């Protein structure tokens, strides 16, 4: 089962990735993890990637693709994998297709967890942190006993600047610009599956498994 998992910030993609990896015993392959491993192991591509990152530059596609290829060629991917955070552009998707073909693999499905924009903004802007003890709350999912006050120490709760509505809007705008061409790309290949991410975690997971033709339990 070779799956690409997509979803905007706030869609719960990380949670679903953990559940899929646990249920089907496949490796979770994220771009960040791949870069960190390649740099730690001091592979040739890892050294190249580190040089660009240290200079504050984007890592070129050819280096990224090379690191992805090295990871997908490892033995633990022969029985399936969950790809997360790559590809981000159509040229990267084309390169991934070619890489998978060379390795005798192919994507079985592209799962996109969809949540309406306003709901995503509610999720992204709902975090509150205690100024005194650092406890974290969420106004929707884990509200404090008393609004604005920490339930542990009574300290004042505040919203971090990177949890503001403006920041959330910008993050979602960037994501939409990046991924819309990818959605059309995978729709044309007949692999795209859109999942309703407004449901509870278990229902979302069940729908993902159904889209993959697998049992959730």
UniProtKB/Swiss-Prot annotation:
<keyword id="KW-0808">Transferase</keyword>
<comment type="pathway">
    <text>Purine metabolism; AMP biosynthesis via salvage pathway; AMP from ADP: step 1/1.</text>
</comment>
<dbReference type="InterPro" id="IPR027417">
    <property type="entry name" value="P-loop_NTPase"/>
</dbReference>
<dbReference type="InterPro" id="IPR006259">
    <property type="entry name" value="Adenyl_kin_sub"/>
</dbReference>
<feature type="binding site">
    <location>
        <position position="153"/>
    </location>
    <ligand>
        <name>Zn(2+)</name>
    </ligand>
</feature>
<feature type="binding site">
    <location>
        <begin position="10"/>
        <end position="15"/>
    </location>
    <ligand>
        <name>ATP</name>
    </ligand>
</feature>
<feature type="binding site">
    <location>
        <position position="92"/>
    </location>
    <ligand>
        <name>AMP</name>
    </ligand>
</feature>
<feature type="binding site">
    <location>
        <position position="127"/>
    </location>
    <ligand>
        <name>ATP</name>
    </ligand>
</feature>
<feature type="binding site">
    <location>
        <begin position="136"/>
        <end position="137"/>
    </location>
    <ligand>
        <name>ATP</name>
    </ligand>
</feature>
<keyword id="KW-0067">ATP-binding</keyword>
<feature type="binding site">
    <location>
        <position position="130"/>
    </location>
    <ligand>
        <name>Zn(2+)</name>
    </ligand>
</feature>
<dbReference type="InterPro" id="IPR007862">
    <property type="entry name" value="Adenylate_kinase_lid-dom"/>
</dbReference>
<dbReference type="GO" id="GO:0008270">
    <property type="term" value="F:zinc ion binding"/>
</dbReference>
<feature type="binding site">
    <location>
        <position position="150"/>
    </location>
    <ligand>
        <name>Zn(2+)</name>
    </ligand>
</feature>
<keyword id="KW-0862">Zinc</keyword>
<dbReference type="GO" id="GO:0005524">
    <property type="term" value="F:ATP binding"/>
</dbReference>
<feature type="binding site">
    <location>
        <position position="36"/>
    </location>
    <ligand>
        <name>AMP</name>
    </ligand>
</feature>
<feature type="binding site">
    <location>
        <position position="160"/>
    </location>
    <ligand>
        <name>AMP</name>
    </ligand>
</feature>
<keyword id="KW-0963">Cytoplasm</keyword>
<comment type="subunit">
    <text>Monomer.</text>
</comment>
<feature type="binding site">
    <location>
        <begin position="57"/>
        <end position="59"/>
    </location>
    <ligand>
        <name>AMP</name>
    </ligand>
</feature>
<feature type="binding site">
    <location>
        <position position="31"/>
    </location>
    <ligand>
        <name>AMP</name>
    </ligand>
</feature>
<dbReference type="Pfam" id="PF05191">
    <property type="entry name" value="ADK_lid"/>
</dbReference>
<feature type="binding site">
    <location>
        <position position="171"/>
    </location>
    <ligand>
        <name>AMP</name>
    </ligand>
</feature>
<dbReference type="GO" id="GO:0005737">
    <property type="term" value="C:cytoplasm"/>
</dbReference>
<dbReference type="InterPro" id="IPR033690">
    <property type="entry name" value="Adenylat_kinase_CS"/>
</dbReference>
<dbReference type="Pfam" id="PF00406">
    <property type="entry name" value="ADK"/>
</dbReference>
<keyword id="KW-0545">Nucleotide biosynthesis</keyword>
<keyword id="KW-0479">Metal-binding</keyword>
<dbReference type="GO" id="GO:0004017">
    <property type="term" value="F:adenylate kinase activity"/>
</dbReference>
<comment type="function">
    <text>Catalyzes the reversible transfer of the terminal phosphate group between ATP and AMP. Plays an important role in cellular energy homeostasis and in adenine nucleotide metabolism.</text>
</comment>
<feature type="binding site">
    <location>
        <position position="133"/>
    </location>
    <ligand>
        <name>Zn(2+)</name>
    </ligand>
</feature>
<dbReference type="GO" id="GO:0044209">
    <property type="term" value="P:AMP salvage"/>
</dbReference>
<feature type="binding site">
    <location>
        <position position="199"/>
    </location>
    <ligand>
        <name>ATP</name>
    </ligand>
</feature>
<keyword id="KW-0547">Nucleotide-binding</keyword>
<feature type="region of interest" description="LID">
    <location>
        <begin position="126"/>
        <end position="163"/>
    </location>
</feature>
<comment type="similarity">
    <text>Belongs to the adenylate kinase family.</text>
</comment>
<keyword id="KW-0418">Kinase</keyword>
<dbReference type="InterPro" id="IPR000850">
    <property type="entry name" value="Adenylat/UMP-CMP_kin"/>
</dbReference>
<protein>
    <recommendedName>
        <fullName>Adenylate kinase</fullName>
        <ecNumber>2.7.4.3</ecNumber>
    </recommendedName>
</protein>
<feature type="binding site">
    <location>
        <begin position="85"/>
        <end position="88"/>
    </location>
    <ligand>
        <name>AMP</name>
    </ligand>
</feature>
<feature type="region of interest" description="NMP">
    <location>
        <begin position="30"/>
        <end position="59"/>
    </location>
</feature>
């Amino acid at each position: 089962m070779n799956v690409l998992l997509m979803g905007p910030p706030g869609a719960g993609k990380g949670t679903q990735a953990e559940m899929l990896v646990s249920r089907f015993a496949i490796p979770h392959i994220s771009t960040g993890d791949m870069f960190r491993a390649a740099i730690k192991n001091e592979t040739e591509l890892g050294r190249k990637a580190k040089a660009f990152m240290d200079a504050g530059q984007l890592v070129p596609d050819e280096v990224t693709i090379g690191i992805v290829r090295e990871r997908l060629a490892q033995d633990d991917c022969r029985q399936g994998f969950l790809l997360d955070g790559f590809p981000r552009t159509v040229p990267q998707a084309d390169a991934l297709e070619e890489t998978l073909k060379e390795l005798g693999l192919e994507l079985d499905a592209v799962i996109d967890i969809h949540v309406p924009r306003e709901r995503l903004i509610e999720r992204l802007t709902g975090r509150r942190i205690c100024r005194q003890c650092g406890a974290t709350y969420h106004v929707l999912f884990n509200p404090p006993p008393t609004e604005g006050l920490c339930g542990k120490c009574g300290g004042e709760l505040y919203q971090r600047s990177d949890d503001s509505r403006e920041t959330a809007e910008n993050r979602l705008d960037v994501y939409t610009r990046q991924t819309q061409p990818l959605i059309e790309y995978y729709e044309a290949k007949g692999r795209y599956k859109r999942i309703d991410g407004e449901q509870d975690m278990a229902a979302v997971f069940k729908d993902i498994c159904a889209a993959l033709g697998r049992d959730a339990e």
